[in-house]
Regions:
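Cross-family detector of peptidyl-prolyl cis-trans isomerase
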Residues: 3-138
Length: 138
């Protein structure tokens, strides 16, 4: 279950410890456009992902398109955009920052690992920081 926090990213880290079972969201900008319907809508977003432990950016995309709730992205990314009951879905024009726990990202397997599994761009057990801007609901 996501927890919404209004304010800067600094309180997000402290709040993250209290919300260890879920995504912690900072609402940077509340959109005024169409609200996302999880399981129905396809969205276009700009996003960046960084390792929570080092702040090293590991991924980013502009105009990324995916079906919300369709299993196309990690569960935490879906919760940021589509909401989860405790946090409302995003609206077009909105922007959020969030910390996604490893269990709702890549878990114990990590991602971008070499064939030996020793070098991973996202190490196993790593929490991730997302910045997401909702551009369009298709």
């Amino acid at each position: 279950m996501a927890k919404t926090i209004v304010g800067a990213l600094a309180p997000l880290v402290a709040a993250r410890a209290r919300a260890s079972d879920g995504v912690v969201i900072v609402e940077e900008t509340v959109g005024r456009g169409v609200e996302v319907l999880a399981g129905v809508d396809v969205v276009k977003v700009n996003y960046t992902v960084a390792l929570a432990s080092s702040k090293a950016r590991v991924d980013s995309a502009k105009f990324f398109v995916f079906g919300v709730g369709a299993g196309e992205v990690v569960e935490g990314f879906d919760a940021i955009v589509g909401g989860d009951g405790a946090t409302p879905p995003m609206r077009v024009g909105g922007a959020r920052k969030a910390v996604v726990p490893a269990a709702l990202a890549y878990g114990d397997r990590g991602a971008g690992c070499d064939k030996t599994g020793n070098a991973c761009s996202i190490p196993p057990g790593e929490d991730l920081e997302f910045t997401v801007e909702l551009l369009e609901v298709k």
